[in-house]
Amino acid sequence: MIGILKKVFDVNQRQIKRMQKTVEQIDALESSIKPLTDEQLKGKTLEFKERLTKGETVDDLLPEAFAVVREAATRVLGMRPYGVQLMGGIALHEGNISEMKTGEGKTLTSTLPVYLNALTGKGVHVVTVNEYLAQRDANEMGQLHEFLGLTVGINLNSMSREEKQEAYAADITYSTNNELGFDYLRDNMVLYKEQCVQRPLHFAIIDEVDSILVDEARTPLIISGQAQKSTELYMFANAFVRTLENEKDYSFDVKTKNVMLTEDGITKAEKAFHIENLFDLKHVALLHHINQALRAHVVMHRDTDYVVQEGEIVIVDQFTGRLMKGRRYSEGLHQAIEAKEGVEIQNESMTLATITFQNYFRMYEKLSGMTGTAKTEEEEFRNIYNMNVIVIPTNKPIIRDDRADLIFKSMEGKFNAVVEDIVNRHKQGQPVLVGTVAIETSELISKMLTRKGVRHNILNAKNHAREADIIAEAGMKGAVTIATNMAGRGTDIKLGDDIKNIGLAVIGTERHESRRIDNQLRGRAGRQGDPGVTQFYLSMEDELMRRFGSDNMKAMMDRLGMDDSQPIESKMVSRAVESAQKRVEGNNYDARKQLLQYDDVLRQQREVIYKQRQEVMESENLRGIIEGMMKSTVERAVALHTQEEIEEDWNIKGLVDYLNTNLLQEGDVKEEELRRLAPEEMSEPIIAKLIERYNDKEKLMPEEQMREFEKVVVFRVVDTKWTEHIDAMDHLREGIHLRAYGQIDPLREYQMEGFAMFESMIASIEEEISRYIMKAEIEQNLERQEVVQGEAVHPSSDGEEAKKKPVVKGDQVGRNDLCKCGSGKKYKNCCGIGK
């Protein structure tokens, strides 16, 4: 009875029922679509586009458009989408997340809403986690879309601007999440409208949406420039930290991963660096370097958090196990690890532009996603992205056997049991996939299997290049594959014909802190109704068990006299593990939510600056905007110099000096004239004189040259001030949590101070632009230039070398071309003399 009631009130079930009716409509259209010739089928695309211009909506077209795609897929790809795939497509079109189990054909499902939404001509982005998948899907599914008369583009990291513009101009663009984010940032750093590559963000479908919007949500995309800093302090701090002893000189909390100096450690530091007080303001940099060196030595572990490769520190993604080349830890932690490992210490970088995936993807008009595991994060998707998770039924029932966890007393006992299980299954010819959380675990199991004479493949960040081949062999008879954190998502493990009746065995060597990652590992077995078995092996020494109170259980095992070879198989323990995972997930969600609240402060500021930049780029004449800036600058200067209530205390001389230095010429404004006026009357004659001088300046050159000069000044000032502001906001953010000790809400303080800093930056921009316009010599330097050369810092480049991406430069001028300064001379005889 309860089960029936649950189904009646189950929102998901109601959605499925509603979509089932639409699927029946699509099925009913099949008889009229099937007889069409290829040409008639292609002609449907033009017919749909015309119907849209006459007032029909994409929702009206859905049943017929889906029926057309289904028929085209059957003809072009030899694959006919099932009813459940049509449901998945409907959920995606409605801006939701389709949870479809591994092997249920998510890629084919995506073609349905992609085609329908591409009919509008506004562009559809299909987002994948790496370039291999983007290329694979663009090549395979692109055939279908091109058959139906739509254009398909692929956007890769290595492409030139022209190639990217072509890719984005297509009806459908396949790309990675990183590349989309970086292109957006770069588009807001260009100096000419023609250099932009993206169109307005219309509709995106994200494959492996949980990986991008949850796991990578806290990873900001950064375009950075070099900041020159001394590397010596890192060396000194590293040498000092090596002399410290745990618990005596520093304390380490395993749960929070916090490490800090004790009183003894502080005294030791003061002696070592010959200073009186480590917490004195003049030693802020030293304290920061010591703290980062401590984190590098105590919290960060080689081959778990990072690897050393070709003399560089490369971060390991804790969720996917992939190497994240090109990405660096911030706040000097990366340099501290470089000092620890004795490799070359690289300069800290300065952020020129930054955005998180959370804020980038929220800019799309409509957003949807697909994954095999999203239900556990449903609240987050709904609250942050306004997307519901719809669990799509499987085409065939799942017959996989998910066994209860086996818990051992020690790691040694656990690994012995894992290897024994692998050996037994290998003898029977059953393919085995072993999931590990860290690279060192996969290498340990590999050594143990080698001793037993079992041939196997390892799939981790170190040999990422062979990933697709290893996954392709993983379902063959007797295959043993060890994978770190399910690297290889997006590639199916297909079973060999001779073992279809046995299925794949999945063995987990540790529970991940996220249930989703465990579910992804389980989901590799039993795809499309195949048999399969999954089993997790745990030990009391696993990190998750250590962090969440396994001491009582360990004591109980000791009391019962259990040895290492006897596991506990208990639902109670499995429930305890699951509740620990829920707690960690809750903590992680709170952290991401908090990050978003902080990032929203910068997002609002970024939108203001980027919108103004866009207006400047598109505007033919900036004079009106600049006059407004001059007016504000003058009013601020007058207010600043006439603050006192008593007239004698006004600093009129200081005001005149300021105006002479920054905006006007000597004698333009006289002290005695201003003394006769009230503060609110002073601005008017000053502004009138400024406009007169502005007019004089305009007469000195052709109008076109003057307009370009204005743009050069505005871009140079805005970009310089904005990058300095981002850096200042970074520093504010780093120290703001300390305000909590004074019973002050850090977020509110960050919002208020961030707003005050933004206001002050705007004032500074207006003042500097006014000064340059009135005081700069115009003959030289008329070409728009980037303030700093920027380079994309990839949060993950899937093990491939991150290519340096300088921010675009203006067009090159030939020596015999007319000089861009407007003099009418050839470049070689003008600004290019001596070049």
UniProtKB/Swiss-Prot annotation:
According to its UniProt record, which protein family does this protein belong to? Belongs to the SecA family.
Q: Which organism is it from?
A: Bacillus thuringiensis subsp. konkukian (strain 97-27)
Q: What is this protein called?
A: Protein translocase subunit SecA 1
Alphabetically sorted, this entry's keywords are: ATP-binding, Cell membrane, Cytoplasm, Membrane, Metal-binding, Nucleotide-binding, Protein transport, Translocase, Translocation, Transport, Zinc
Q: Which InterPro entries match?
A: Helicase_ATP-bd, Helicase_C-like, P-loop_NTPase, SEC_C_motif, SecA, SecA_CS, SecA_DEAD, SecA_motor_DEAD
Membrane topology value: Peripheral membrane protein
**Which residues are involved in binding ATP?**
85, 103-107, 492
Q: Which GO terms of type biological process are on file?
A: intracellular protein transmembrane transport; protein import; protein targeting; protein transport by the Sec complex
Q: How does it assemble?
A: Monomer and homodimer. Part of the essential Sec protein translocation apparatus which comprises SecA, SecYEG and auxiliary proteins SecDF. Other proteins may also be involved.
Q: CDD domains, alphabetically?
A: DEXDc_SecA, SF2_C_secA
* EC number per UniProt: 7.4.2.8
Cofactor binding mode and count: May bind 1 zinc ion per subunit.
Q: Which NCBIfam families match?
A: PRK09200.1, PRK12904.1, secA
